[in-house]
Design a protein with these regions (language model features):
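Catalytic cores of enzyme domains
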Residues: 101-276
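Non-catalytic, usually N-terminal nucleic-acid engagement modules in DNA/RNA processing proteins
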Residues: 1-111
C-alpha cells in the first residue's frame, strides 16, 4: 500500500472500530446510574502523524516538557518510522452531562475510566490493522514498559510518564496546549488521546502552529469553570491542586476518578477558538 492509501485504510478501520465496538458504549450492567445506560463515550477521532525521527521528540527530554524519563519512538519499537496520534472527542451526551455542578457527572466518570480502557483497546486494534498490512506496530500505553507516576505515589511530582500522549499529539500536528495543559484540537479540547508507534512510513501531518500554546486564546473561561481554583492566567494549572481534587472524587464512586469541568462550557470545548 502507498503511504496515503495506508493512512486512509487506518482512518477507515479506526472509525469503524469506534462506531461499532461495544467498548465505546456503557451497558446496563456497568452503568453508575440509569442516565448512563447506552451511553456512547466517543465520536470518531482526529488522526495525526509524525516521523519517528522528528527533532521535537528529543526536545521532550527537557524537564520543562516531559523530562528525561521520556522514551523515544525507537525505544518502543526497533525500526520505528512513524508515530500515529489520535484524539477522540467526547460524545455530546458526555459533554452536556458535565456542565452543571462541581462533581463530575456519572457519564464523565465513565468516559474517563471505561473510556481509557477503550482507548487502549483501540491502540491494540490500530496495531493489528498495521500488522495486517505488513508492518510492525506497538501501542505504548498498552506496553509493559509504560510507566506513570502520580502525586499520591510520589509527593515530589503531580504526574509524569515516560510517554506523554499530550506531547505526542502536539508533535503529530493535532493541536497545542491550553491554559489547563490539555490539548486544543480542531475538534476542541473535550476528549482523550492515544497513540501507536509503527515501522510503516506514513504521510506526516503538517503542524499549523509554531508555539506550544498557539491555539489557546487565554480567555480565562476555564478559570471560572474549575471547582477548586486550580487555574490562573499567570501560572496556568496547579497540577497538585487538580490531582488532589481528582483523589477526592474517588470517594464518591470507588474505582472512578474524574472532573473535566474545564473542558466543557468553554470556547475550546468543540473547536479551536479564533484569536480575537
Amino acid at each position: 500500500m502507498e503511504p496515503n492509501e495506508l493512512l486512509a485504510y487506518l482512518q477507515d478501520g479506526i472509525n469503524a472500530f469506534v462506531e461499532g465496538s461495544s467498548g465505546n458504549y456503557i451497558s446496563m450492567r456497568g452503568a453508575l446510574s440509569p442516565s448512563s445506560v447506552g451511553l456512547k463515550l466517543f465520536e470518531p477521532p482526529l488522526i495525526g502523524v509524525a516521523a519517528a525521527n522528528d527533532p521535537l521528540f528529543e526536545e521532550m527530554l527537557d524537564e520543562k516538557a516531559v523530562g528525561k524519563q521520556m522514551l523515544m519512538p525507537p525505544d518502543w519499537l526497533e525500526g520505528a518510522q512513524s508515530v500515529v496520534s489520535y484524539f477522540l472527542p467526547m460524545s455530546e451526551r458526555v459533554r452536556q452531562s458535565n456542565l452543571e455542578g462541581d462533581l463530575a457527572s456519572t457519564e464523565w466518570f465513565h468516559a474517563r475510566i471505561e473510556g481509557q480502557m477503550f482507548i487502549m483497546r483501540l491502540g491494540d486494534q490500530v496495531a493489528r490493522l498495521l500488522k495486517a498490512a505488513g508492518y510492525d506496530a506497538v501501542c505504548p500505553a498498552c506496553h509493559p514498559s509504560m510507566k506513570t507516576t502520580f502525586h499520591d505515589e510520589n509527593p515530589s511530582v503531580a504526574y509524569h510518564s515516560n510517554w506523554s500522549e499530550r506531547h505526542i499529539a502536539y508533535i503529530c500536528g493535532l493541536g497545542t496546549f491550553s491554559l489547563t495543559r490539555g490539548i486544543i484540537t480542531e475538534k476542541g479540547a473535550a476528549g482523550r488521546l492515544g497513540s501507536v508507534v509503527t515501522t510503516a512510513v506514513l504521510p506526516v501531518t503538517e503542524r499549523p502552529y509554531s508555539g506550544i500554546d498557539d491555539y489557546c486564546i487565554k480567555c480565562g473561561a476555564c478559570i471560572d469553570r474549575c471547582p477548586v481554583n486550580a487555574i490562573s492566567l499567570e501560572t496556568g494549572k496547579d497540577n497538585y491542586a487538580c490531582h488532589n481534587a481528582l483523589l477526592e472524587s474517588k470517594k464518591v464512586y470507588p474505582g472512578y476518578v474524574g472532573c473535566g469541568k474545564c473542558q466543557v462550557g468553554v470556547p475550546c470545548e468543540y473547536t479551536r477558538p479564533v484569536q480575537p
